[in-house]
Amino acid sequence: FCGWLSDRIGRRPVLLAGLISGALTVLPVFHGLSYYGSLPEPNTTMIVVLLLVLVVPLACITGPQTATLPELFPARTRYTAVALPHNLAAGWIGGMSPFMVTWLGVRFGDPLAGLWYPTGLLILASVVGLLFLPEVRNRPLED
């Protein structure tokens, strides 16, 4: 749905909606998961609903991402321009996430404190997107 939506209204608004809604929902959703999962009779329905809340920002980011990245760069540099930052981010951000989440949880004595790491990254990405991400919908892919 989000890829289709980005074809209709633009890549930038859908991506920014995903980043901002992700930053706003990560902490409350995990607090809810902690609460509903620790009840004597865990509320499975609420747990599923809360997990689905996180799917919306993810879909808003990944849906248009595959169209946005190629549209940002000319054909002669596209492969390197897309692959290099994508894989560096996957390695550095994705690779460091378990360590950072665990370290923050231990450092502050709260297992949910580690969620400030992905929340902070989403806030940073939102600011960068607001300042620098152009609208690329309908941009020709030829040089």
Model-derived regions, located:
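Membrane-helix boundary and inter-helical linker elements of multi-pass secondary transporters
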Residues: 7-8, 71, 106-108
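A late C-terminal transmembrane helix in Major Facilitator Superfamily
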Residues: 76-108
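Hydrophobic/aromatic and small-residue hotspots that mark the transmembrane alpha-helices
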Residues: 2-6, 97, 101, 133
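Intracellular juxtamembrane helix-capping segments at the cytosolic ends
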Residues: 60-73
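C-terminal ends and interior cores of transmembrane alpha-helices
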Residues: 20-40
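Hydrophobic core of transmembrane alpha-helices in multi-pass small-molecule transporters
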Residues: 41-61
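Cytoplasmic membrane-interface "Motif A"-like loop-to-helix N-cap segments
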Residues: 8-19
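Multi-pass alpha-helical transporter architecture, strongest
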Residues: 29-32, 68, 120-143
